[in-house]
Amino acid sequence: MAQNSLRLVEDKSVDKSKALEAALSQIERAFGKGSIMKLGAKDSVVEIETVSTGSLGLDIALGIGGLPKGRIVEIYGPESSGKTTLALQTIAEAQKKGGICGFVDAEHALDPIYARKLGVDLENLLISQPDTGEQALEITDTLVRSGAIDVLVVDSVAALVPRAEIEGEMGDSLPGMQARLMSQALRKLTASISKSNCMVIFINQIRMKIGVMFGSPETTTGGNALKFYASVRLDIRRIGSVKEREEVVGNQTRVKVVKNKMAPPFKQVEFDIMYGEGVSKTGELIDLGVKAGIVEKSGAWFSYNSQRLGQGRENAKLFLRDNPELLREIETALRQNAGLIADRFLENGGPESEGDEAADM
């Protein structure tokens, strides 16, 4: 084995720039050109490419205008809270920009009719329904390494069942096997995801920890590895119902940015998810407009630039739906004031309130 040409030099008079140049050239000879560089040498390294979530409020709360590409994202929450809807809306937004998307349906529960209603182009959506967790993660790894995928969704971590568990009998105890599977897969995936600039969204479920006296008893499945590797973690909750007279037509939803490596975390935003429609864009623009002072609210009346939108929130939503030019004008004004909204108007729940919030649900 060849000896290293570099050695520790104790002489303080040595030229550091020459020593650094020698070290860099040795690293490049050993591992190839581009294995080490100055961060500012490539502008593309600094810029963060994003994909919209389909919710303007959530894009603002994330601080960078959407979910980051080349990163791992985790969306978790209780049942029927809107996890898959949010992931499908992100796929739809990526496809609008010409991106190629994939969906690893480990739960075998994807509804193509609902996905189409959310704006997903089913003809160009890659879908896989694997039999085991190992198969699902191998497919994920292969797609990511191809470098052709922009957004890949894995639904869900809880359904990634290890092969040994499937081949075993009911009642067999296999502690920690799923956590080990996820830990190994994420170790392999992380570098590939960054190099291919592919966003991988893991949807996760909630479980209860037994015997917890203080703090939140909730935890996510698949061990702790995903919590560490994820650049963004979103906690999505259903906080109420949207009604038309006596009929329930949607859910009021709250999303909290629990972890964010790209911008300040712990921001939270609320919006409506309408059945068969997805995130209510008009309702969200009205709410954000009122918070930013762009849309005026006087009693039950909503108005914009002295033009009345309607009496009551639902009537204002219908008016904006019938007037897309006015809707776009309000959206443009909100995007121009995105920094102001993020700083002043989005509720900012610190980490200490996370356990209390979970307990209130």
Curated annotation (Swiss-Prot):
Keyword Membrane: no
Keyword RNA-binding belongs to the record: no
GO annotations of cellular component type: cytosol
Molecular function terms from GO: ATP binding; ATP hydrolysis activity; ATP-dependent DNA damage sensor activity; damaged DNA binding; single-stranded DNA binding
One GO term of the biological process aspect: DNA repair
Alphabetical UniProt keywords: ATP-binding, Cytoplasm, DNA damage, DNA recombination, DNA repair, DNA-binding, Nucleotide-binding, SOS response
Reported function: Can catalyze the hydrolysis of ATP in the presence of single-stranded DNA, the ATP-dependent uptake of single-stranded DNA by duplex DNA, and the ATP-dependent hybridization of homologous single-stranded DNAs. It interacts with LexA causing its activation and leading to its autocatalytic cleavage.
Similarity annotation: Belongs to the RecA family.
HAMAP family: RecA (MF_00268)
Protein name listed in UniProt: Protein RecA
Species: Sinorhizobium medicae (strain WSM419) (Ensifer medicae)
Gene name for this UniProt entry: recA
